[in-house]
């Protein structure tokens, strides 16, 4: 299995990818993740507003914190702004997506 990540992958998404890699269940392909290693709790205030506070820290199954460093992919595949925009617009076909193609190639080589 391959898991695609980038700088928009954070929190539970990056810990999911890290856990799969630590259990040798997946290779990680793409760009470095954000490194948001904390979880928050939202406290409601009497006036109807709210405040979110970090109340804990995530760790991978092997006890590694990704806070402020994220995950470095096994296969690093940076994409330019034009490709990123096409991905988010839904106009990039998988055959032209460099990260998907790198993942397919990496899986074929296993």
PLM regions: where:
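C-terminal recognition in membrane/secretory proteostasis and scaffolding
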Residues: 77-110
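Conserved acidic, small-residue-rich alpha-beta core segments centered on
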Residues: 1-88
């Amino acid at each position: 299995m391959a898991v695609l990540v980038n700088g928009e992958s954070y929190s539970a998404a990056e810990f999911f990818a890290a856990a799969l890699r630590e259990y040798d269940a997946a290779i990680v392909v793409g760009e470095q993740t954000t490194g948001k290693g904390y979880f928050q709790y939202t406290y409601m205030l009497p006036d109807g507003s709210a405040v979110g506070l970090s109340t804990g820290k995530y760790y991978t199954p092997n006890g590694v914190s990704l806070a402020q460093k994220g995950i470095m992919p096994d296969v690093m595949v940076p994409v330019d702004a034009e490709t990123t925009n096409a991905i988010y617009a839904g106009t990039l076909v998988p055959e032209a997506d460099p990260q998907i193609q790198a993942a397919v190639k990496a899986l074929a080589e296993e």
